[in-house]
C-alpha cells in the first residue's frame, strides 16, 4: 500500500490573471492535500507556473515586453491571488527554474536513446508578412470536429487535439492573413511504439480505477481511434532548446516540457526530490486537472515517463473536472469575461466564501454556471443559516445560560449514533476526491445538529432539566469542534477561528473526530459571516458584466418566450422546493387568506400567504409536505409578506387541489428541489427571482396523475420519486 501522497494541480499558464474557472484545480488539490495531511499521510502539494511556449510569446508581443519580464510580472500576480485564497502549496515554483532545462533535455535524450523519437520533414504554416514559421498557437481557424473557433493545438470547445493543418480557414494570429505551407523538419514522440506499454499500464486495475469516469472514457476513446506520432518541437524562440544538431533554432513544444515541470519544480526546492518522483511503489501521484488537460496527463506525460524506461512515479489517481462558466458564458482571459482573482479580492467578500461556493458547485460531472444570485442564496442558506447558525446558536446559548466553562460531559450515545457513522463516509469521499459530495455530507451533519438543537428546545428545558440541557449543549459543542475539522479543507480561516473560540492550539486531525475531551472553556465568540445582501450582489453583477455582456443579456431577456422550450424555461427560470407546513394562521384582515409557516430545510421559517379558505381546513394541511415556487419575487397580501407560492392542480371543471407530496410514498425532505427527470446528476444553478407570469409560462401539467413539462416528469432531486397529482390526474398546474 502506498504511504505518501504527491499532489499536483495543473500548472497554470502565466500569461494572464487567473479567473475563478482557473482556480478550480488549485483549490481542489488544496482541499485534498489538507485532508491528506489531517489524516496523517505524508503529503507534498506541488504546483507552479507554466512559462514557456506560444501563449507566453504572443502575450509578450501584445504587451510589448520580453517573455521573461512578462513571466516575472504574472508569476507575482498568481502568487498573490493564491495566497489570498489561502491555497497552501508546499511548493509553488516556475518552469523557468534552473533545473527545468536539464531535466527536460535529459528526458528527450533518454527517449531518443530508447528509439521513441522520430525526425520528420513536414509542411508547416509560414506567414509571409511576418516572415516566420507559425507554431500551433499562432494559427487560428475553425475546428473540423465541432466547427468552433480553435487554436492550432487543441479545440477548447470539444477538447479535440489538433494540428494547425487540421483547421478550416486558418489564419495567422498576429496579422490575420492566411498562411502558406512550407517544408521544415520537426521531431516527433513515437506514441504508436509506446502504445502497448501504455495500454498495459492503463489496464492495470491499480491505475485507472482511481480516475474520473470522463477521464477514462476520453482516454479509451483516444486509444481506440489510434495513437499518432506527436510533434514535440516548435519554431519559437521562447522555450527549452532542443539538444540535437540541426535543431538549434527550435524549442520543445510546451506540452512536452510543461508536465515535466512538476518534477523540476520539486527538485528546485527539495534535496530528496527522488523520494517523491522516483518512488512509484510508495508514492500515490494524485493529479487535479481540467477536462481540456486530460489527454496530456493520461497519454502524453505517462508516455514520456514510460518511454524513458526509468522508475518514475506515475499517475495513480486523477481528478478531472468540467468547466466552471460565468452567467451562461465561458470565462475568457482574452475577452475578460467573468470574475478574475484580483476582482474577487476587491469585492469585499471573504476568501472562505469564495472557496465554499466553488467547492459546493465544483463541476465534477458536468459544467456549472457561476451565478451571482445563486452565490448569494447558497451562501446565505447553507453556509450561514445552516453551518454558521449552528456554531453561533450553540456557543451563545452555552455562554448565556451556563457560562464559559465546559464541564466534563456525559456522552449522549443516541446523539452520537446519528453522527459518527457519517464521518467515515465523508473521509472516504475525500479519499476518492469527491469533494463536492464530501462538503454536502458535512452540511447535512450541520443541519442535523440544528435539528437536534431545535427538537430538544433547550430554551424551554434549561430550568426544569438543567443537567440534561448542559449535556446536550456540551455534546453539540464537540460536534462543532468536529465540523471545524471536517470543514478545514474547504474554509480554513473559518475553521481556525472556530477552534480559537475554544482557546486551544489547533487540532486538525481526523483521529480526534468523535472524541469528547479537550475543550475546557469558550474564550470568545463572534459571528462567522455576514449575509450577502441583494443590493450588493446586484451591483457586483452589473460591475462585472461588461458592456458587451450587458447588451447580450438584455437581448436574451427580450427574446419572445414562445421560442423557448418550456423545459428550458423551467430549468433556467423556475425553482420549486418541497416544504413542510409547520403552522397555519388566518390573516386578521382577510379571513380567506391562510398564512403558512413553512420548514424549507434552512431552520428558519419561511412564510407564504394563500387563499385556501373554502378549499381546505387548517387540519387538512398542517404537517403536510407541499411544493412552492421558491424564487418568486416577494409580495404583500393585505399587509402580510408572502415569500413564495404553493402549487396546485386544476381540472377543466375548475376543481382545485394543492399538490401534496406524500411522506409514505415519496419520502420528501424539506428543502429538497424539484427537477426534471432528465436533469438527474446535473449541477443546476439557482435561478433569479421571477414573477408569476414567468412561472406560468413553464406550462406544468398534470398528466395521468403525474406532473410533467412537455412530457418530461418532475421528480424529487434526492429520492428521484415522481411528483404525483392523485386528486387531479389531468389538468393544469398553477
From Swiss-Prot:
Cofactor or coenzyme needed: Zn(2+)
Localization: Cytoplasm
Main location: cytoplasm
EC number assigned by the record: 6.1.1.10
One matching Pfam family: Anticodon_3
Cofactor: how bound: Binds 1 zinc ion per subunit.
Annotated InterPro entries: aa-tRNA-synth_I_CS, Anticodon_Met, Met-tRNA-synth_bsu_C, Met-tRNA_ligase_1, Met-tRNA_synth, Methionyl/Leucyl_tRNA_Synth, MetRS_core, MetRS_Zn
Enzyme class: ligase
Organism domain of life: Bacteria
Assigned keywords, A-Z: Aminoacyl-tRNA synthetase, ATP-binding, Cytoplasm, Ligase, Metal-binding, Nucleotide-binding, Protein biosynthesis, RNA-binding, tRNA-binding, Zinc
Binding site for Zn(2+): 143, 146, 155, 158
Recorded catalytic activity of this chain's protein: tRNA(Met) + L-methionine + ATP = L-methionyl-tRNA(Met) + AMP + diphosphate
Record GO terms (molecular function): ATP binding; metal ion binding; methionine-tRNA ligase activity; tRNA binding
HAMAP family hit by this protein: Met_tRNA_synth_type1
Protein task: Is required not only for elongation of protein synthesis but also for the initiation of all mRNA translation through initiator tRNA(fMet) aminoacylation.
Family: Belongs to the class-I aminoacyl-tRNA synthetase family. MetG type 1 subfamily.
Assembly and binders: Homodimer.
Protein's UniProt name: Methionine--tRNA ligase
Protein's organism: Borreliella burgdorferi (strain ZS7) (Borrelia burgdorferi)
Gene that this sequence comes from: metG
Amino acid at each position: 500500500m502506498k504511504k505518501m501522497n504527491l499532489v499536483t494541480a495543473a500548472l497554470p499558464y502565466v500569461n494572464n490573471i487567473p479567473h475563478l474557472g482557473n482556480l478550480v484545480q488549485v483549490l481542489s488539490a488544496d482541499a485534498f492535500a489538507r485532508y491528506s495531511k489531517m489524516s496523517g499521510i505524508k503529503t507534498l502539494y506541488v504546483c507552479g507556473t507554466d512559462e514557456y511556449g506560444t501563449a507566453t510569446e504572443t502575450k509578450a508581443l501584445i504587451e510589448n515586453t520580453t517573455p521573461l519580464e512578462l513571466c516575472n510580472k504574472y508569476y507575482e500576480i498568481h502568487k498573490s491571488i493564491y495566497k489570498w485564497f489561502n491555497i497552501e502549496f508546499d511548493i509553488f515554483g516556475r518552469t523557468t527554474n534552473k533545473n527545468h532545462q536539464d531535466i527536460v533535455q535529459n528526458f528527450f535524450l533518454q527517449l531518443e536513446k530508447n528509439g521513441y523519437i522520430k525526425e520528420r520533414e513536414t509542411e508547416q504554416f509560414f506567414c509571409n508578412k511576418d516572415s516566420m514559421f507559425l507554431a500551433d498557437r499562432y494559427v487560428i481557424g475553425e475546428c473540423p470536429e465541432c466547427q468552433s473557433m480553435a487554436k492550432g493545438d487543441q479545440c477548447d470547445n470539444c477538447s479535440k487535439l489538433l494540428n494547425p493543418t487540421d483547421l478550416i480557414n486558418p489564419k495567422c494570429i498576429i496579422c490575420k492573413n492566411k498562411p502558406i505551407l512550407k517544408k521544415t523538419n520537426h521531431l516527433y514522440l513515437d506514441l504508436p511504439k509506446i502504445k502497448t506499454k501504455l495500454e498495459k499500464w492503463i489496464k492495470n486495475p491499480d491505475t485507472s480505477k482511481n480516475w474520473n469516469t470522463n477521464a477514462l472514457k476520453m482516454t479509451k476513446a483516444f486509444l481506440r481511434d489510434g495513437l499518432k506520432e506527436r510533434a514535440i518541437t516548435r519554431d519559437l524562440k521562447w522555450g527549452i532548446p532542443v539538444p540535437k544538431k540541426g535543431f538549434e533554432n527550435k524549442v520543445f513544444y510546451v506540452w512536452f516540457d510543461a508536465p515535466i515541470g512538476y518534477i523540476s519544480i520539486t527538485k528546485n526546492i527539495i534535496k530528496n526530490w527522488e523520494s517523491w518522483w522516483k518512488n512509484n511503489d510508495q508514492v500515490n501521484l494524485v493529479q487535479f486537472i481540467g477536462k481540456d488537460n486530460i489527454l496530456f496527463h493520461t497519454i502524453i506525460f505517462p508516455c514520456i515517463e514510460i518511454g524513458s524506461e526509468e522508475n518514475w512515479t506515475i499517475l495513480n489517481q486523477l481528478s478531472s473536472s468540467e468547466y466552471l462558466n460565468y452567467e451562461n458564458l465561458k470565462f475568457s482571459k482574452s475577452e475578460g469575461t467573468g470574475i478574475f482573482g484580483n476582482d474577487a479580492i476587491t469585492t469585499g467578500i471573504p476568501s472562505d466564501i469564495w472557496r465554499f461556493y466553488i467547492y459546493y458547485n465544483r463541476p465534477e460531472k458536468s459544467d456549472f454556471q457561476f451565478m451571482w444570485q445563486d452565490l448569494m442564496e447558497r451562501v446565505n442558506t447553507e453556509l450561514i443559516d445552516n453551518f454558521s447558525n449552528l456554531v453561533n446558536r450553540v456557543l451563545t446559548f452555552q455562554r448565556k445560560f451556563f457560562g464559559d466553562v465546559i464541564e466534563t460531559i456525559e456522552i449522549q450515545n443516541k446523539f452520537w449514533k446519528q453522527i459518527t457513522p457519517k464521518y467515515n463516509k465523508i473521509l472516504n469521499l475525500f479519499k476518492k476526491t469527491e469533494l463536492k459530495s464530501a462538503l454536502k455530507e458535512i452540511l447535512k451533519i450541520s443541519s442535523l445538529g440544528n435539528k437536534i438543537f431545535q427538537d430538544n428546545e433547550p430554551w424551554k428545558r434549561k430550568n426544569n432539566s438543567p443537567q440534561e440541557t448542559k449535556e446536550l449543549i456540551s455534546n453539540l459543542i464537540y460536534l462543532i469542534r468536529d465540523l471545524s475539522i471536517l470543514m478545514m479543507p474547504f474554509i480554513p480561516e473559518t475553521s481556525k477561528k472556530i477552534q480559537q473560540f475554544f482557546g486551544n492550539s489547533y487540532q486538525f486531525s481526523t483521529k480526534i473526530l468523535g472524541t469528547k475531551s479537550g475543550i475546557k472553556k469558550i474564550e470568545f465568540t463572534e459571528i462567522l459571516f455576514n449575509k450577502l445582501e441583494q443590493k450588493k450582489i446586484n451591483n457586483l453583477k452589473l460591475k462585472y458584466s461588461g458592456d458587451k455582456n450587458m447588451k447580450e443579456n438584455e437581448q436574451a431577456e427580450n427574446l419572445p418566450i414562445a421560442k423557448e422550450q418550456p423545459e428550458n424555461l423551467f430549468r433556467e427560470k423556475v425553482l420549486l422546493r418541497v416544504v413542510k407546513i409547520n403552522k397555519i394562521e388566518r390573516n386578521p384582515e382577510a379571513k380567506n387568506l391562510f398564512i403558512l409557516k413553512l420548514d424549507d430545510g434552512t431552520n428558519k421559517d419561511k412564510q407564504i400567504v394563500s387563499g385556501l379558505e373554502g378549499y381546505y381546513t387548517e387540519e387538512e394541511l398542517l404537517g403536510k409536505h407541499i411544493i412552492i415556487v421558491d424564487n418568486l419575487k416577494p409580495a404583500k397580501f393585505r399587509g402580510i409578506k408572502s415569500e413564495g407560492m404553493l402549487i396546485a392542480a386544476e381540472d377543466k371543471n375548475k376543481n382545485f387541489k394543492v399538490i401534496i407530496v406524500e411522506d409514505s410514498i415519496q419520502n420528501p425532505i424539506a428543502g429538497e428541489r424539484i427537477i426534471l427527470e432528465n436533469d438527474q446528476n446535473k449541477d443546476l444553478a439557482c435561478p433569479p427571482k421571477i414573477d408569476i407570469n414567468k412561472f406560468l409560462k413553464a406550462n406544468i401539467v398534470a398528466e395521468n396523475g403525474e406532473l410533467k413539462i412537455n412530457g418530461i416528469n418532475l421528480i424529487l432531486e434526492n429520492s428521484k420519486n415522481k411528483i404525483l397529482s392523485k386528486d387531479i390526474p389531468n389538468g393544469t398546474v398553477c
